[in-house]
A protein has these predicted regions:
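Acidic/polar low-complexity surface segments
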Residues: 123-126, 168-176, 277-283, 324-347, ...
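Bacterial N-terminal signal peptides that target proteins for export
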Residues: 1-7
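Right-handed parallel beta-helix
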Residues: 150-160, 183-197, 213-224, 236-246, ...
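Structural detector of coil-to-beta-strand junctions
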Residues: 134, 202, 209, 218, ...
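Acidic Gly/Asp/Thr-rich repetitive segments characteristic of extracellular carbohydrate-active
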Residues: 95-136, 341-377, 381
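Extracellular beta-strand-rich solenoid/capping regions of secreted or surface-exposed proteins
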Residues: 113-129, 136, 141-155, 164-213, ...
Length: 639
């Protein structure tokens, strides 16, 4: 659950650091056409070892070699060729199933509005479910009020966000829980569209009052946006690769990450606001206001996105790797001439999965036949893991599909190969406990993937809440160079199957690989370390965590016989290099228990931790910020 708000004294713990953190050198993104940067079709040694030379196409049925697209000779483009992402035919409009709804600007706006209102009435308060909706908008102009409820994914199908322009609102309100409280507005996304707020709706400000497990991506707000609803509590949140023309106001948001967003004018602060690679980030001196500014995003690929070509054919754009990136990837494009951020895949390169039909067997057969996966909305019961074994495979969900293992296995495993993309999934623990729900690389993985890393986007984890379930760990990352972009790893504190001995879970994430990077890591309520980092060279840009509410007593929650509780963020003693910016750890214990530290790390010169804070309620608490220093209650570090 999002943070409970409680009064606590504020203590400044000054170590002396400005709000502009020592980040990577500021600069524009790398040239998307530079093959050395590992385009999404990038051929790797793993691809070659698998027997697929660069540029090799799959056969007409999708059978045969790896799902890697076409090799690193594919230039940035909006169109495919037989050797670069092309399919065997013009696929046209795919059968996405009943919960994917496609709107066109030629439809009467009243008809679209009625359908949107019907869906929203169903999803507004539908906190726990496994069936969502993907709402797809063909390029054009719309006049609509698009309210985004639980498990709702709003997608523009243009090459540029401005190709789909919605005049009115694309908004998330906080009415269902009462008191304009947005702290449980989980699991929803909007991407690749423009919104023009109008005075008739919320006085002309777009409202995006969300909590964890949400995202705005490739969104152009042609006006102002507020991240809270009418002064009510809010606990988010994540925006990436977007542009805000006028003003963005955080209001009551407790914490937030914006990455590669053209902000124009950010207003507001509360506990922990982190800005990575943004255009026009706010200025100030930590901890008043609690801003962390990293000038450029060191290494990232943007999330793949759906779009249609002039013939109405669907494609998936897979953006290229970029380094030292500042600002949105598209905001400087000339109107009407969007620059391709990578190279595309025809939709018929994808196996389109449906929850009423598909199992682990059918999904793995599709992967073995060289297909990528596009999972449509709904709940997928898996008697074994989805096994991604080929480099450059894309597994993408629309409408927040929910994957649940039923036999105590992982829901998803990825081999130690280059360039895999996993996006838009909610992974849920089953009744039979899993050692891990997602595994990236097998134990002992050692390959260098720095030129073409695997990446996760908007992949979230839930243990309990909707169904009773247990898992030791949400994510285990064994491969090197993995990028995790926005993940909420949640042991449920309310809902079905919730209790100290019910939805048991040790950690949200365990990182064993080297040089793993996380942007927007949210991990909450697990029973040991929320995040355990065993690999060297890790980098985290924004961390938000609540310790478990429910330890029954101190004796039941001890890291060692002499140390109370567990640190939320633990960097193992063997680690020599680690970097983190903007970490917030909170405690709201139901019983009078304590954690000795919020964060524990080695103390060598290679361990660099910038801008940490804690918040504790009146019951129990966190004794220190890091390694026995920082003080109790609410405290800020300044380094």
């Amino acid at each position: 659950m999002a943070t409970r708000v409680a009064a606590a004294a504020m203590i400044a713990f000054a170590l002396g650091c400005s709000s502009s953190a020592e980040g990577p050198h500021s600069g524009m993104s790398a040239d998307a056409g530079d093959g050395s940067m590992g385009s999404p079709d990038g051929a790797s040694s793993a691809a070659s070892d698998a027997g697929t030379p660069p540029g090799t196409d799959q056969d007409a049925e999708g059978n045969g070699p790896p799902a890697g697209t076409a090799g690193n000779n594919c230039p940035p483009s909006w169109t495919t060729t037989p050797a670069c992402g092309g399919g065997s035919y013009d696929a046209g409009v795919p059968d996405f199933g009943p919960n994917v709804i496609v709107f066109t600007p030629s439809m009467p706006m009243s008809t679209i509005q009625n359908q949107l209102d019907t869906i929203y009435a169903k999803m507004d308060a539908d906190q726990f479910d496994d069936l969502g909706y993907a709402l797809l908008f063909m390029p054009g102009q719309y006049s609509l009020d698009v309210q985004v409820g639980f498990y709702t994914h709003v997608i523009g199908l243009g090459e540029s966000p401005d190709d789909v322009t919605i005049t009115g609102a694309v908004r998330v309100m906080a009415d269902w829980l009462g008191n304009d409280n947005a702290t449980q507005n989980f699991w929803r996304t909007a991407e690749n569209l423009a919104v023009v707020p109008t005075a008739a709706i919320d006085d002309g400000t777009d409202i995006w009052a969300t909590a964890q497990g949400t995202a705005l991506r490739r969104v152009h707000v042609r006006g102002s946006i507020a991240l809270y609803d009418d002064g009510g509590w809010a606990s988010g949140g994540f925006i990436a690769d977007s542009k805000i023309d006028t003003q963005i106001t955080s209001g009551s948001q407790q914490q937030y990450l914006t990455r590669n967003v053209d902000l124009t004018n950010w207003q507001g602060s509360n506990w922990n606001m982190v800005f990575v690679g943004d255009g026009q980030p706010p200025s100030g001196t930590w901890p008043h206001p609690p801003y962390t500014v990293v000038n450029a995003t060191p290494v990232v690929r943007e999330k793949p996105f759906l779009y249609v070509d002039s013939g109405g054919n669907y494609l998936v754009m897979v953006p290229a790797l970029k380094t030292n990136a500042t600002g949105s990837s598209w905001g400087a494009d000339a109107p009407g001439s969007p620059v391709p951020p990578g190279s595309p895949l025809s939709i018929d390169r994808f196996y389109i999965a449906k929850p009423t039909v598909d199992t682990a067997t059918t999904l793995n057969a599709a992967l073995a036949a060289g297909k990528h996966l596009l999972l449509t909305p709904g709940g997928y019961s898996l008697d074994g893991p989805i096994e991604v074994t080929q480099p450059n495979t894309v597994v993408i969900g629309i409408g927040l599909p929910v994957l649940t293992p039923t036999n105590g296995t992982a829901a998803l495993t990825v081999a130690d190969v280059d360039g895999v993309t996993i996006a838009g999934l909610l992974i849920q623990a089953g009744a039979k406990s899993s050692p891990t729900l997602v595994e990236m690389g097998s134990p002992g993985s050692s390959a260098d993937h720095s030129a073409n890393p695997t990446a996760l986007f908007d992949v979230n984890c839930r243990i309990g809440g909707y169904i009773a379930g247990t898992a030791s760990v949400c994510f285990t990352i064994n491969s090197n160079d993995v990028i995790d972009d926005d993940s909420w790893l949640w042991r449920a504190d309310h809902g079905t199957g919730v209790g100290w001995t019910a939805n048991m879970s040790n950690s949200g994430i365990v990182v064993n690989g080297d040089d793993v990077t996380a942007y927007g890591l949210f991990s909450e309520h697990h029973q040991s370390f929320q995040a355990l980092w065993n690999g060297n060279g890790g980098s985290v840009y924004f961390y938000q965590s609540e310790m478990p509410y429910d330890p029954p007593n101190q004796g039941a929650w001890m890291e060692s016989p002499s140390e109370d509780g567990y640190a939320s963020y633990k960097v193992s003693d063997n680690v020599t290099t680690h970097l983190a910016f903007g970490l917030g750890v909170y405690s709201f214990f139901d019983n009078p228990v304590h954690a000795a530290n919020a964060i524990e790390t080695p103390t060598g010169s290679g361990i660099v931790m910038h801008h940490m804070m804690t918040y504790s309620s009146a019951t129990g608490g966190i004794n220190d910020i890091i390694n026995g220093t920082g003080g109790p209650a609410t405290a800020y570090s300044a380094n």
